[in-house]
Amino acid sequence: MNPANYLYLSALLFTIGASGVLLRRNAIVMFMCVELMLNAVNLAFVTFARMHGHLDGQMIAFFTMVVAACEVVVGLAIIMTIFRTRKSASVDDANLLKG
């Protein structure tokens, strides 16, 4: 398959994720859209690494996935705390984290 197709797919996935973050108010859906955006960037990194014959893009994608896994743990813990206290996963209820 042509590497340009992977880049088009990456751009499409990033656009879908960005529109989901901007248009949705549910924290879990927004969280999934951010993860979709990260995976789109990882696909672009791996595609560019494959095109140029280097492993740098693949290493960056690997470390991005490691950081994303840590982000999932912390993010879901915060979302579950908000859901337990407010009985809603709306980002409008996130003001309870203010000091």
From Swiss-Prot:
Protein family per UniProt: Belongs to the complex I subunit 4L family.
Keyword match Cell membrane: yes
Lineage of origin: Bacteria, Bacillati, Actinomycetota, Actinomycetes, Mycobacteriales
Assembly and binders: NDH-1 is composed of 14 different subunits. Subunits NuoA, H, J, K, L, M, N constitute the membrane sector of the complex.
Protein keywords: Cell membrane, Membrane, NAD, Quinone, Translocase, Transmembrane, Transmembrane helix, Transport
Protein name listed in UniProt: NADH-quinone oxidoreductase subunit K
Presence of the UniProt keyword Methyltransferase in the record: no
Record GO cellular component, one term: plasma membrane
GO molecular function, one term: quinone binding
Protein localization: Cell membrane
Topology term for the membrane: Multi-pass membrane protein
GO BP terms: ATP synthesis coupled electron transport
Domain of life: Bacteria
EC number: 7.1.1.-
Cited Pfam families: Oxidored_q2
